[in-house]
Amino acid sequence: MVPLRSFVLLNSLFLVLLAARTVVTRVIDKDNSDRIVKTQNDQNLSKVPFNLEETYTADFLAYVFNGTWTSDTTIVYTDRRTGDILQFDVIKQRSTLIVDSSVMDAYIVSNYVLSPKGRYLLIGYDLKKGYRYSTFMRYVIYDIEHRAYHKIGNDMHIALAKWAPLTDDLIYILDNDIYYMRFSNNGFNDVQRVTYDGISGIVYNGVPDWVYEEEVLQDSSAIWFSPDGNHLAYASFDDRNVQEILYLHYGEPGNLDDQYPTEVKIKYPKVGTLNPVVSLTLVDLHDPTLNKIDLKAPHYAVGTDNLLYNVQWKDFDHVVVTWSNRVQNKTEIVWYNMYGEIVKTLHVVEHKGWLDIKHLFFYKGSVYIRKLQPSGTKAGRFHHVTRYDETFKQSPTQMDLTPDAIEVQNICTIDQSNGRIYYLASGLGKPSQKNLYSVPADGSEKPTCISCNVLTPEGNVCTYADAIFSPLGQYYVLVCHGPDPAFVSIFNNAHQKVYSWENNLSLRKKLAKRHLPLVKDLDVRANGYESKVRLFLPHNFDESKSYPMLVNVYAGPNTLKIIDAASYGHQVYMTTNRSVIYAYIDGRGSSNKGSKMLFSIYRKLGTVEVEDQITVTRQLQEMFPWIDSKRTGVWGWSYGGFSTAMILAKDTSFVFKCGIAIAPVSSWIYYDSIYTERFMGFPTPEDNLSGYNETDVSRRVEDIRGKKFMLIHGSGDDNVHYQQSLALAKALEKADVMFEQITYTDEAHALFGVLPHLYHTMDRFWSDCFSLSHAH
C-alpha cells in the first residue's frame, strides 16, 4: 500500500543507458541560467486564488531531473519539447543529438531506451496498463547504424524488456517466460528461451505477481544482471495455490461488446491465506545450455513460508539476497557464489516491530546497511548507516556511523575512491526534512550535511532533497524539492555547483500570480507523545474570524503527511479559494521520529494513530478560537480512507462533523497478506484475531451516526477491493446509519479517469458540511 497524493500524474519513465558516441549530429546549448524572472514589481501583481481544476492536473507540477547518468561525466536525457534523445557532457556543458525523435513517428510511443553501446533504440508502444508499476507494450528495436526496425516477441504485448549491461543483448518477458536476445556486429543474431513454465496470471518468471509488485519489489522487474551482463538472477512466483479475487468489468456504456460484464480474476493472497511460492535462479547467459542454479532460501532462519526481499550483485561472482520470514521481523542476508553455495550470512532480528532492510553497499571488506540503532534519546532507535565487518564472525561487530536522533531514509552511494558514504536523512528534530549527508566509511569523522548549504533561487535553505550520483561518484545531480518549487543542479564531489539543470522558471512565474496559503508548523502533545502539525491558513487569514478546518489524513505506519517538499494540490485550493484551514497531523506510527513512536502502532492498526488524529484536532480547536469546532471535517484515501472511517467511528465527542473515505480498507482481513501481516501478524485466536476485530470499521458503524459521511470507491480497484466499501456500506445500512456513497464504475485505486467528478463531488460535500457557497 503506497500513499496517494492529492493529484496523480502518469509520466513515462525514460530509463536510458548509453555509452559515449563519437558521431555528433548537432550541438545544442542548454539554458544554464540561475535567474528568477520577475515581472516588473512582483509585489504589485494582481494575484488570484487557485481553481479546483488546477490542483488535480499537472498545471502546477514541477519538472525534475529527466536524465540518466551513462558515465561519470555524461547524461542522456529526452528533450521535453522535441522528444529528441540527447547526451549532455558535464565538463563541456553542452548537449549532442543522439537520436532524432522522427525515428519514432510511426508509433504511439510510451517508452524508449538506448542500448549501452548506443547502437539500438528499444521502442515501446501500444501500452496496456498492468498494476501499479507494470505495463504491457509492443516493442520494436531500431538499428541506428543501419536505420532498420526489428519487431521482437512476434509483435505481442511484452511485460518487460531490458538491455544487459555493457552489451547490446536484451532480455524480454513474454507470457511470463524469459527470452534472451543476442546481437552481434552484424545486427540481430538469435533468441534463446530461458524458461518454459510460465503461465499467464499463475506462474511468473522474471516479473512479479500482484503482491510482490505492490508490497515488496515495488517494481515491474524481477531480474538482476551481473555487472558484466554475463549472468542473470531471476525470481519466479508460483501462484497456483493462491486464492483469487474476482470483480466485474462493465465496459463502455451502450457498447454491444460489453453486453455482459467481464470477470477479472487476480491471484491475491489475503491475510492468513497461502502466499505465492517464490524461488530464485541463477543462469549463465553465455553458456549455450543456459545452465541454471537454484539459490535456495535459508529455511533454517526464515522458515519455508518466506519472502524474497532484495537481490543485488556484490561483484561479478557473488549475489547477495535478503530473505525474510512471513511476518517480516526476521531477515537473513545471504551471500551466494556462482555455484549456488552459501558463502556467508548476516542475521537481523527485530523484536518490537518489523524490519525494513534496503539495498546494501560494500567497501574494502565491510558491508553497509540501514539499520535501527540507539539514539541516546527517549525517542528510541533510529535507522542509521551501520557498518559490519564482512568476515562475519559469530557475533559480527557493527559500527554506527550516523549516531543521533535523525532518520537515515536511504543510502545513495559510496565514493570508492575517497571512501565516503552519501545518504539522505531527516534533520535533527525535523522529521519533515530530507537532506543529503556524507560521512567517512571508516567513521573517523562526524557526518556533514551537504544540501544544508544549498539555497533555493528564492534564497531559502533547501530542506528536502534527492540526489542521483554518477557511476563513480565524481558528480551528482541534486534535486531540491522544497521549501520552494523544485530546482535541479549538478555538483562535483567537492560539492561545487557546476551546472543548473532545471529552475522551473515558468512554474515560478505562474505561482507569482497566485495567492499562497500561510503555513504554521507546531508540536502538540497528545496521549503522551509529540505529534507534528502543519496548518495551511488562508492567504488573507484574520485571527478575529472563525474558519472551518479540513484534516487530510493518511496515518499509515512508517509514513508522513508533513514533508518539506513544495506541492500545490488540494490544500492550496481549499485555503485560497474556499477560506478553509487545511491540516496535516503526524502522530504515533509515523516515520522519522524514532522507534518508540513508530512501533507504538505494531499489531494494532486503527487504534493509536486514529486516537492521535482526534485528540490533536480537539486540542487545536481549544488552542485557537479561529478554528470553528462546529465546522471541522476529515478526509483520506486508501489507508487514509480507513483512518477517516475509523476516526468518525471513534470520535464520540463529535470533534469532526463530516468525513470522506476514498477507497478505504474497512477490515484488514480483506487486505493482502504481506502488507497486513507485517504490522498485524495473523488473524488467528493464537496470534492477533482480537487485534483484527478491534480495527474492523464495520463493527463500529453505530458511532458514525449523526456525522455526515461519504464513501467513495472504484469498482475496478485491484488493490483495496470494492468489497471493502461494500462490506462497510452493508454494515451501515443494516444499522440504519445514513451516509452517501459514490461508485466509480471500472475505476482502479487512483481513480485516474474520474478526477474532475471526484473533486467536484468532494467540493460540494465540503460546501454543505461547512455551510459554504457552492463553487461548482
UniProtKB/Swiss-Prot annotation:
The lineage of its organism: Eukaryota, Metazoa, Ecdysozoa, Arthropoda, Hexapoda. Its main location: secreted. Its EC number is 3.4.14.5. Venom dipeptidyl-peptidase which removes N-terminal dipeptides sequentially from polypeptides having unsubstituted N-termini provided that the penultimate residue is proline. May process venom proteins into their active forms and/or modulate the chemotactic activity of immune cells after the insect sting. Pfam families: DPPIV_N, Peptidase_S9. GO terms for molecular function: aminopeptidase activity; dipeptidyl-peptidase activity; serine-type peptidase activity. This is Venom dipeptidyl peptidase 4. Inhibited by diprotin A. Glycans are attached at N44, N66, N329, N504, N577, N688, N693. The keyword Electron transport does not apply. It comes from Vespula vulgaris (Yellow jacket). Keywords: Allergen, Aminopeptidase, Disulfide bond, Glycoprotein, Hydrolase, Protease, Secreted, Signal. Belongs to the peptidase S9B family. DPPIV subfamily. Disulfide bonds join C449-C452, C462-C480, C658-C769. The keyword Oxidoreductase does not apply. Gene3D superfamilies: alpha/beta hydrolase, Dipeptidylpeptidase IV, N-terminal domain. GO terms for cellular component: extracellular region; plasma membrane. Expressed by the venom gland. It is found in: Secreted. InterPro entries: AB_hydrolase_fold, Peptidase_S9_cat, Peptidase_S9B_N, Serine_Prot_S9B/DPPIV. It catalyses: Release of an N-terminal dipeptide, Xaa-Yaa-|-Zaa-, from a polypeptide, preferentially when Yaa is Pro, provided Zaa is neither Pro nor hydroxyproline.
